[in-house]
């Protein structure tokens, strides 16, 4: 073998690692994961779910129940007669119900199962049994009477809660690949999804507004809030420690007033912002004025509006003089809204309003912090109105974060627990209203109440996962109620892994007509992949993270940062003035720490970055986001913003001063200078450089070979088609019961592949095969992207695939719950066809490997009530083989006889004419012909291509990457090496054509990849050199066997009489406008009539020649000795009316009406005339249209020729 040419200092080849992969497959590692990058890809999902039960405060769920607090009710009973007389305001005994602790158990079988060898339930069992993988949700209830006079505790089982795989509540957590295989899982099972009714469901990640950061917005809809409202506003999404959020908005009114808006239980409320300020702390108008205006006393625009703001409040609410009065006023107005307890004073209710609504991220004890932040927001609002700063772009990644699935799961669970407590109180209130004898101190009464309350919270969470619909009283501060979950489809591994890197903008934005939200903005560099997005209606809304982007799932420790900032010269925020043009506000996670000059702020930001990368300063986490916004003319509002919270997008870059890794976020990246390659670095300009340019691409986009040589839409198409490929969804297919699975039997590792291909272990799930491809117009069957396949290659397994289908047979569906079992698998003693035993065993179940066709029996059962043996038959028109038969026990785990089985079919799918194939460059096409080998062209070395494609596929698509892959694959096959196809490893000076051309020349082939070929039909040399190489091809799941529709007759629509649509309903194929135009353009009028009329809704209708109507014609009653005729009611006259019009002739004789002109309508009515009708052929839908228009008073008239 000749020596491979390698450029000095750059390795562009790799090993296939075939033996290493085989060894790892046979002997999975027992100590660690083989592919840690796969685990990192799903970490946001698992980490967010783990945070529910892990953390310094016992997890987010326990923080949530603390925020819920206690629910209170009074029984209205006096302690004794003296209390009733002396204290008329006595409410009775007080009952407080709260949740002390929440815990989620690992999935286990029921305790009553004595036959269970292993009580642990593993995911593979849930998949095969088509059940849900869930653990018990346990709530520790506290039943307190009269503020702790007597406390009762009880642990309640609130149903089975679906558990995320590989989370800390899953049995697979921390298992090695070897142990995973022992438990019937993939050796690298990544988890991150739920199993609901045997289906793998995933909570999709959503883009939401960045937390705890006030954002300036100009939105025309703000002006619709009321009179004098403008389109200016400041919006902040404030997030509690349990990850639930509350959005606060400041509205600017045209008269200078500012209104505070919030939403509570899907209702909006507006409060003057001065009222909120005066309720937060003891303050004066002077303090508010100084706090907002700062040093800008000479700014007349600001001072005039502040004066109007303060005077307007005093004029409207003259009776509110101090904080106590304001709190009481708020409490009085919101007592009913917040369902306050009767024993709470207005003052306490007002304080609760502030705690639950106003800037909740600052806590219940942060009134001063809330006061300062509101002043900052008001000042920013006035700057926006004055034009001093620009509005923030809510569609930019800088102002966005990710709503993780685990956090959303916890938010919904918290609300369901809150509803559970409300239902308990409602049940007690119902007993009180009915006058029942109740005793709060009686534990038996407590048990009776809890028995009558629906405790199955787990089923509600299972409903959310199975449907994706959010049933919420509050709306959870989200903009959509559906579309939260998707099926983690395992069509192939590319599609499966993409689900976990997918992020959606929200279904609300999908309905907008504007395209602003879909645009790819520069701020998303390195965080969202610019290539991996669908090309249809979700384009730009459904994105995928770059492969190096990760999401924070834990709160970084920022407790020491304030002291570090003070040591660097930040003035503490003891003075309540807002940042003017001369001062820079310093904030940490939405809390104002202090103030500093802008010059010093830049120095502090650079110093903090140096120290955090250096790693020698305690208290500075590496993932701290340091966003310094410098002052500018009408730019973003300046300040130094530090972030260390959850749900932030983060990515690694190299920090040049220390040559170490730095973690940056989207907010700070906008104001950083990051070079893409080391060659671009400029001294005193760039502070960072990318590790590699491919960090901006997603996992799938990185796998497209030489994508930098392709037109960008082709790379987008490949990201979509790679997920539609019939590949290898997994290895443990025998332990799955998916409704439909595709598997490529002849998958190969690509000769041309990127470095990340091996890092992510894609060879465990091959997605295609290497094919010898010739670019030649050879037969005429390759027009319009069609491709010709070598028939011998097809016979040797080229693209051979298999489809698996699973059918569940449940005899329990035929009886009600609790009824005795009357149907049993097997054969009875009655008479039944003995040929059934050819397919079925004596137990009534099919033999493994049995060939079944439509109508063949797949199982037999005996019905006691009918004393008869029945069978279930195979319904598909496509023959199959019985692959597996699984016996499924009852979900309640009660020991009883077999009632449910699942049968898996294996359906052969050899490539057929009409099946779709594609390369990895978006070059898709259907198989148009399987060409005999003897007629295929061949090269001088006797090689015949597997695939022939048309040269016209390249010029308009500009997929130069496919040319390069063909060269590289050919050279790699000749030298036995794997070629590196990572983007941007070549340039104009070092081209891939030279690099791979030299390899081909060393092997004795043409430098440019061309070869002389000989005609398979004549044996003569073709007059042109043919471009031949090795390209990795994919077989897509769009197969003709799943889509072809053929029918001569079949069901029709009862209204239009046209064939119904749908392959499953034996419907027809619609001949649309384009097909109609094509037939008209070709002048095939008879074919057009045949398709659109004769074979569709052909009907014969009677039309009146005189009035031109088809609706007024009617069949007459035939007379004796005559035939029935069709007459027109509109053009006829009643016989009685016709008699009155009789006239006499000149000679005095009467004129009689001819009997042939008289006809009856079948109801005894006689008519004269209206006989001028004829029969025409029309589409039935025309008659339907005529009747619909006539109902609206519109008449259609038809001209009939000849008259």
Curated annotation (Swiss-Prot):
Consequence of substituting residue 1127 to R: Responsible of suppression of RPA190-5 and RPA190-1 mutations
GO BP of this protein: nucleolar large rRNA transcription by RNA polymerase I; ribosome biogenesis; termination of RNA polymerase I transcription; transcription by RNA polymerase I; transcription elongation by RNA polymerase I; transcription initiation at RNA polymerase I promoter
Signal sequence, start to end: none
GO cellular component, one term: RNA polymerase I complex
Zn finger (C4-type) start-end: 1104-1131
Catalytic activity: RNA(n) + a ribonucleoside 5'-triphosphate = RNA(n+1) + diphosphate
GO terms assigned for molecular function: DNA binding; DNA-directed RNA polymerase activity; ribonucleoside binding; zinc ion binding
N-acetylserine modified-residue sites: 2
Record-linked Pfam families: RNA_pol_Rpa2_4 (PF06883), RNA_pol_Rpb2_1 (PF04563), RNA_pol_Rpb2_2 (PF04561), RNA_pol_Rpb2_3 (PF04565), RNA_pol_Rpb2_6 (PF00562), RNA_pol_Rpb2_7 (PF04560)
Enzyme class: transferase
EC number: 2.7.7.6
InterPro entries noted in UniProt: DNA-dir_RNA_pol_su2, DNA-dir_RNAP_su2_dom, DNA-dir_RNAP_su2_hyb_sf, RNA_pol_bsu_CS, RNA_pol_bsu_protrusion, RNA_pol_Rpb2_2, RNA_pol_Rpb2_2_sf, RNA_pol_Rpb2_3
Keyword Acetylation among record annotations: yes
Effect on the protein of changing residue 1107 to A: Lethal. Abolishes recruitment of RPA1 to Pol I. No effect
Keyword hit for Nucleotidyltransferase: yes
Residues where Phosphoserine is found: 81, 1156
Localization per Swiss-Prot or TrEMBL: Nucleus, Nucleolus
Keywords, alphabetical: Acetylation, DNA-directed RNA polymerase, Metal-binding, Nucleotidyltransferase, Nucleus, Phosphoprotein, Ribosome biogenesis, Transcription, Transferase, Zinc, Zinc-finger
Further facts: Three distinct zinc-containing RNA polymerases are found in eukaryotic nuclei: polymerase I for the ribosomal RNA precursor, polymerase II for the mRNA precursor, and polymerase III for 5S and tRNA genes.
PANTHER family listed in its UniProt record: DNA-DIRECTED RNA POLYMERASE I SUBUNIT 2 (PTHR20856)
Entry's family note: Belongs to the RNA polymerase beta chain family.
Function per UniProt: DNA-dependent RNA polymerases catalyze the transcription of DNA into RNA using the four ribonucleoside triphosphates as substrates. Component of RNA polymerase I (Pol I) which synthesizes ribosomal RNA precursors. Besides, RNA polymerase I has intrinsic RNA cleavage activity. RPA190 and RPA135 both contribute to the polymerase catalytic activity and together form the Pol I active center. In addition, subunit RPA12 contributes a catalytic zinc ribbon that is required for RNA cleavage by Pol I.
Name of the molecule in the record: DNA-directed RNA polymerase I subunit RPA135
């Amino acid at each position: 073998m000749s020596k491979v040419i390698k450029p000095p200092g750059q390795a562009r080849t790799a090993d296939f690692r075939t033996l290493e992969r085989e060894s790892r497959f046979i002997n999975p590692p027992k100590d660690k994961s083989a592919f840690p990058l796969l685990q990192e890809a799903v970490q946001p999902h698992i980490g967010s779910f783990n945070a529910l039960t892990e953390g310094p405060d016992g997890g987010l769920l326990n923080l949530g129940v603390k925020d819920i607090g206690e629910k209170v009710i009074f029984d209205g009973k006096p302690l004794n007669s003296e209390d009733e007389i002396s204290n008329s305001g006595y409410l009775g005994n007080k009952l407080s119900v709260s949740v002390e602790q929440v815990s989620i158990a690992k999935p286990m079988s029921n305790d009553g199962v004595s036959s269970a060898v292993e009580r642990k339930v593993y995911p593979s069992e849930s998949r095969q049994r088509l059940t849900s993988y869930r653990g018990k949700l346990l709530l520790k209830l506290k039943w307190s009477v009269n503020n702790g006079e007597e406390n009762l505790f009880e642990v309640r089982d609130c149903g089975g809660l679906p558990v995320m795989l590989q989370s800390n509540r899953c049995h697979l957590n921390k298992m090695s690949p070897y142990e995973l295989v022992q438990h019937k899982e993939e050796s690298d099972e990544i988890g991150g999804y739920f199993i609901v009714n045997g289906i793998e469901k995933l909570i999709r990640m959503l883009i939401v507004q960045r937390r705890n950061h006030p954002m300036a917005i100009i939105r025309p809809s703000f002006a619709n809030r009321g009179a004098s409202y403008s389109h200016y506003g400041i919006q902040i999404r404030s997030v509690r420690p349990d990850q639930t959020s509350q959005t606060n908005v400041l509205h600017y009114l045209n008269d200078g007033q500012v209104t505070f808006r919030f939403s509570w239980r899907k209702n909006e409320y507006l409060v003057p912002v001065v009222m909120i300020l005066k309720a937060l702390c003891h303050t004066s108008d002077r303090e508010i004025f100084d706090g907002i205006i700062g040093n800008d006393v000479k700014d007349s625009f600001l001072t005039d509006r502040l004066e109007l703001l303060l005077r307007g409040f005093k004029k409207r609410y003259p009776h509110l003089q101090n904080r106590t009065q304001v709190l009481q006023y708020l409490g009085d107005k919101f007592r009913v809204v917040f369902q306050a307890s009767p024993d709470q004073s207005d003052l306490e209710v007002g304080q609760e309003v502030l705690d639950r609504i106003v800037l909740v991220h600052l806590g219940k004890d942060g009134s001063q912090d809330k006061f300062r932040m509101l002043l900052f927001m008001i000042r920013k609002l006035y700057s926006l109105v004055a034009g001093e700063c620009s509005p923030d772009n809510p569609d930019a990644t800088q102002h966005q974060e990710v709503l993780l699935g685990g956090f959303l799961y916890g938010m919904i669970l918290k609300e369901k627990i809150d509803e559970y407590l409300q239902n308990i109180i409602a049940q007690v209130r119902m007993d009180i209203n009915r006058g029942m004898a109740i005793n709060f101190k009686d534990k038996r009464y407590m048990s009776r109440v809890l028995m009558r309350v629906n405790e199955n919270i787990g089923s509600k969470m299972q409903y959310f996962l199975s449907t994706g619909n959010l049933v919420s009283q509050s709306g959870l501060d989200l903009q959509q109620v559906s579309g939260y979950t998707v099926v983690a489809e395992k069509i192939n591994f590319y599609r499966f892994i993409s689900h976990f890197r997918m992020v959606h903008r929200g279904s609300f934005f999908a309905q907008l007509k504007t395209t602003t939200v879909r645009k790819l903005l520069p701020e998303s560099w390195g965080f969202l992949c610019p290539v991996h997005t669908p090309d249809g209606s979700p384009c730009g809304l459904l994105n995928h993270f770059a492969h190096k982007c990760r999401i924070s799932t834990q709160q970084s420790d920022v407790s020491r940062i304030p002291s570090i900032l003070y040591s660097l010269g930040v003035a503490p925020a003891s003075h309540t003035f807002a940042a003017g043009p001369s001062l820079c506000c310093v904030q940490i996670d939405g809390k104002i720490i202090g103030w500093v000059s802008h010059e010093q702020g830049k120095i502090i930001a650079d110093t903090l970055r140096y120290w955090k990368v250096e790693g020698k300063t305690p208290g500075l986490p590496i993932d701290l986001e340091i966003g310094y916004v410098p002052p500018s003319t009408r730019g973003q509002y300046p300040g130094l913003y530090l972030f260390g919270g959850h749900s932030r997008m983060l990515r690694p870059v190299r920090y040049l001063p220390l040559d170490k890794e730095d973690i940056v976020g989207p907010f700070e990246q906008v104001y950083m200078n990051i070079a893409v390659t080391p060659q671009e670095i400029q001294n005193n300009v760039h502070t960072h450089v990318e590790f590699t340019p491919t960090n901006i691409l997603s996992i799938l986009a990185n796998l497209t070979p030489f994508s930098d040589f392709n037109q960008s839409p082709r790379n987008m198409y490949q990201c979509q088609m790679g997920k539609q490929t019939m590949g290898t969804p997994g290895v443990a297919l025998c332990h799955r019961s998916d409704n439909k699975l595709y598997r490529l039997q002849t998958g190969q590792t690509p000769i041309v592949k990127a470095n990340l291909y091996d890092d992510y272990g894609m060879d465990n799930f091959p997605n295609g095969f290497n094919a010898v491809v010739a670019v030649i117009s050879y037969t005429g069957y390759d027009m319009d992207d069609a491709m010709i396949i070598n028939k011998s290659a097809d016979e040797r397994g080229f693209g051979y695939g298999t489809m698996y289908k699973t059918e569940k047979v449940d005899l329990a569906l035929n009886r009600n719950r609790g009824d005795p079992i009357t149907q049993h698998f097997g054969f009875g003693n009655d008479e039944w066809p003995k040929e059934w035993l050819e397919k079925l065993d004596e137990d009534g179940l099919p033999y493994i490997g049995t060939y079944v066709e439509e109508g063949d029996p797949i199982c037999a059962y005996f019905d006691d009530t009918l004393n008869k043996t029945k069978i279930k038959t195979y319904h598909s028109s496509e023959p199959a083989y019985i692959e597996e038969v699984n016996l499924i026990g009852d979900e309640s785990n009660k020991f009883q006889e077999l009632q449910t089985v699942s049968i898996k079919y294996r359906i052969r799918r050899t490539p057929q004419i009409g099946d779709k194939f594609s390369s990895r460059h978006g070059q898709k096409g259907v198989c148009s012909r399987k060409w005999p080998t003897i007629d295929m062209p061949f090269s001088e070395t006797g090689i015949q291509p597997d695939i022939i494609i048309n040269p016209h596929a390249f010029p308009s698509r500009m997929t130069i990457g496919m040319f390069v892959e063909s060269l590289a694959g050919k050279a790699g096959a000749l030298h036995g090496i794997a070629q590196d196809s990572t983007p941007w490893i070549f340039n104009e000076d070092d081209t891939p054509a030279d690099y791979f051309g030299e390899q081909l020349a060393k092997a004795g082939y043409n430098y440019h990849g061309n070869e002389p070929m000989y005609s398979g039909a004549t044996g003569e040399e073709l007059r042109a050199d043919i471009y031949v190489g090795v390209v990795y091809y994919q077989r897509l799941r769009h197969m003709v066997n799943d889509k072809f529709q053929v029918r001569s007759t079949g069901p029709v629509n009862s209204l239009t009489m046209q064939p119904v649509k749908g392959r499953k309903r034996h419907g027809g194929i619609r001949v649309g406008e384009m097909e109609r135009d094509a037939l008209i353009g070709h002048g095939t009028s008879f074919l057009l009539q045949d398709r659109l009329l004769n074979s569709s809704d052909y009907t014969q209708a009677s039309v009146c020649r005189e009035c031109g109507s088809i609706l007024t014609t009617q069949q007459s009653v035939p007379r004796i000795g005559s035939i029935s005729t069709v007459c027109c009611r509109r053009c006829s006259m009643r016989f009685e009316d016709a008699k009155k019009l009789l006239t006499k002739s000149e000679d005095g004789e009467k004129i009689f009406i001819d009997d042939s002109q008289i006809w009856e309508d079948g109801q005894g009515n006689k008519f004269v005339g209206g006989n001028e009708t004829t029969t025409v052929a029309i589409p039935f839908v025309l008659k339907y249209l005529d009747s619909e228009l006539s109902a609206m008073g519109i008449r259609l008239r038809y001209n009939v020729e000849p008259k």
